[in-house]
Regions:
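Beta-rich carbohydrate-recognition and catalytic domains
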Residues: 3-4, 8, 16-66, 74-131, ...
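C-terminal regions of proteins
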Residues: 383-387
């Protein structure tokens, strides 16, 4: 990138250190506790699928959208706010034609929704051209209830960046586009592909190969550190994934990754990593992909491992006090984004156990994750993937999900039905 006067983008910190790039390594099933996916449909699973399909509160894409994906939502001021990305030109998930979106509607009149473009391909930012748009989320700080932070990925000139715009709930207006920052130790770079690599290398920290899209996960949990509230979540790019934290949702600090530190283990993790912090521990779940790729994202010649995905995701825990990873558990899983939620002081994982037509709920045993138990694994009778589960202001629970990449859909459900004996 050619940096301009008064540019919002900044050069990376310089370092002479040689990067350490960790390989993708197959997770041997016989070395770990395994929680298998099951296809048998229990009455509980059937009831969950029926409730989700019958209690749809609305779809939030534009009628003219031909593709939409990756939803996040929140409630404020008697409205629901939903983020996603969409393609209005073709039915492909193609960042060359995608826009980052925020939609909102009154809870008592969902059909009366407004949809705003947050960023589109072709837009000019600080003199630079947006060439691709990808993963889009929305976040809120506990001490800033009037604003929603809309974070998204864009290829600007020749590099992917994490960018944000602040949406004011009262005025329904979006602020200017600015750049998130990525901090490792004392190194602070733009939150970009090179910014991540350089900041990690500067601090002597390795990473797995990165490619294309950079993501930040949609679920925030918080922890007080030295009198300051930090919000935790996951970040990822290709095979690289890590825990990050922030006190302002603008600058994100690196915390840990499963291939580094005490208890680190080799893995084939890929893309979205669900993170939930409670009791000074970060619970962590991520899908895997059994194919080795090089630094440029190309398959390594001679690698004969499965290139069609992996049947197991990884469940582990990172102790924030001891800075140590727990031995992982392999959970039957397909290729989808997952999400944790706390309900009545119990932690649950929502994921895709069989394929993207199934939703599974796993009760996490926080004393011993190897004793975690399947609540249900439901055939949703159609496309239902990338679940995100959230409370409204009155304690009701909703789930957003993608349907065939045609709809951003949200349903209300009663959790208690599925965990009671």
């Amino acid at each position: 990138m050619n940096y301009l006067e008064n540019d919002i983008f900044t050069p990376d910190i310089s370092t002479d250190k040689t990067p350490t790039v960790y390989p993708c390594v197959k997770t041997e099933k016989n070395k770990y506790k395994v929680i298998e996916a099951v296809t048998e449909q229990t009455p509980r699973a059937i009831a969950f699928a029926n409730e989700i399909n019958e209690n749809v509160i609305g779809d939030f894409e534009r009628e003219t959208d031909k593709m939409c994906h990756v939803s996040t939502f929140c409630f404020a001021d008697n409205n629901i706010f939903v983020s996603y990305y969409a393609n209005g030109y073709s039915n492909e998930e193609n960042p060359d034609f995608q826009s980052a979106r925020i939609a909102f509607a009154p809870m008592n009149d969902i059909k009366n929704k407004t949809v705003l473009d947050v960023q589109c391909v072709g837009d000019i930012i600080s003199g630079h051209t947006v060439k691709k748009v990808y993963d889009t989320i929305l976040l809120q700080r506990d001490d800033d209830k009037d604003n929603i932070y809309v974070l998204f990925t864009a290829l600007v000139d020749d590099q992917y960046y994490r960018l944000y715009r602040i949406f004011n709930i009262k005025t329904k207006a979006l602020g200017e586009t600015l750049v998130n920052r990525f901090k490792v130790g004392n190194a602070v770079n733009d939150f970009s592909t090179s910014g991540i690599k350089t900041a990690l290398t500067y601090n002597g920290i390795g990473y797995k190969s990165m490619r294309s899209d950079i993501g930040i996960m949609q679920k925030l949990t918080s922890r007080i550190e030295n009198g300051k509230k930090y919000y935790y979540t996951g970040a990822y790019s290709g095979d690289f994934n890590c825990i990050i934290k922030s006190d302002d949702l603008l600058t994100w600090e690196y915390v840990a990754q499963p291939v580094e530190g005490k208890g680190a283990f080799p893995n084939d993790t890929l893309w979205e990593n669900a993170v939930y912090v409670t009791d000074d521990k970060a619970y962590y779940f991520i899908r895997q992909w059994e194919a080795s790729i090089d630094e440029n994202g190309n398959p390594i010649k001679g690698d004969n491992r499965n290139e069609q995905g992996c049947l197991y995701g990884i469940l582990t825990v990172y102790d924030l006090e001891k800075r140590e990873w727990t031995k992982p558990v392999l959970v039957g899983d397909s290729q989808s984004r997952s999400d944790f939620i706390m309900y009545k002081n119990e932690l649950y994982l929502f994921h895709a156990p069989i394929n993207r037509n199934h939703i599974g709920i796993l009760k996490i045993n926080r004393t011993d994750i190897e004793k975690s138990e399947v609540v249900l694994q439901a055939d949703m009778n159609g496309s239902c993937f990338y679940p995100f589960v959230q409370y409204d202001t009155e304690g009701n629970i909703y789930m957003s999900y993608t349907v065939d990449r045609k709809h951003i859909r949200i349903s209300k459900f009663t959790f208690e039905k599925y965990i009671s004996d």
